[in-house]
UniProtKB/Swiss-Prot annotation:
Keywords assigned: Chaperone, Periplasm, Protein transport, Signal, Transport
GO process annotations (BP): lipoprotein localization to outer membrane; lipoprotein transport
One Gene Ontology term, aspect cellular component: periplasmic space
Species: Neisseria meningitidis serogroup A / serotype 4A (strain DSM 15465 / Z2491)
Name of the protein in its database record: Outer-membrane lipoprotein carrier protein
The protein's role, per its UniProt record: Participates in the translocation of lipoproteins from the inner membrane to the outer membrane. Only forms a complex with a lipoprotein if the residue after the N-terminal Cys is not an aspartate (The Asp acts as a targeting signal to indicate that the lipoprotein should stay in the inner membrane).
Length: 207
């Protein structure tokens, strides 16, 4: 079964893209305002990954609490959970009965995932510009400033001041499209919601 091409990339990008306070602002201004103001977000997502050989769609839910906490759960067609507790990133693959743990700094510190725990990382890591509108969605084009970022671009779409869509193309030509729903930009989250304990009987690997 094919898994998402780059889970940490996906997590990182989605941490940028939430409902914003001012629907009147341009898409770039809205994105910057979120990174200045927003501390938490929760919701659901549908993700479609297109490669040269196949297309896969997955569904799930997510929670983010700044600084540095996130939980991403794929619920169908497979079950997989990714948790960042501020120090460690845990990836639990239910089908494989396997947990992989990585230092959070090593796993996402040099990638877009740094946005999850650093409100200033967006402007330091990306070049942002307005990228037009389609079907009522206003887009921001985020281009990584470093050539080794692993992807070519990210497009982030807002509709009526709320996150609506995201698209990214990686360095291998794979394209990921994500739609968001049920967004809550003021969720009641505690740090305990981002604690992960490996289930009994699973293999635990370290990166």
């Amino acid at each position: 079964m094919m898994k998402p091409h780059n889970l940490f990339q996906f997590l990182a990008v989605c941490s940028l893209t939430v409902s914003v306070a001012s629907a009147q602002a341009g898409a770039v201004d809205a994105l910057k305002q979120f990174n200045n103001d927003a501390d938490g977000i929760s919701g659901s997502f549908t993700q479609t990954v297109q490669s040269k050989k196949k297309t896969q769609t997955a569904h799930g839910t997510f929670k983010i609490l700044r600084p540095g906490l996130f939980k991403w759960e794929y619920t169908s067609p497979y079950k997989q959970t990714i948790v960042g507790d501020g120090q460690t990133v845990w990836l639990y693959d239910v089908d494989l009965a396997q947990v992989t743990k990585s230092s959070q700094d090593q796993a996402i510190g040099g990638s877009p995932a740094a946005i999850l725990s650093n409100k200033t990382a967006l402007e330091s890591s990306y070049t942002l510009k307005e990228d037009g509108s389609s079907n009522g969605i206003d887009y921001v084009l985020a281009t990584p400033k470093r050539n080794n970022a692993g992807y070519q671009y990210i497009r982030i779409g807002f509709k009526g001041g709320n996150l609506a869509a995201m698209q990214l193309k990686d360095s291998f030509g794979n394209q990921t499209s994500i739609s968001f729903g049920g967004l809550n930009t003021n969720p009641q989250l505690s740090r305990g919601a981002f604690k992960f304990t490996p289930p009994k009987g699973v293999d635990v690997l370290s990166n």
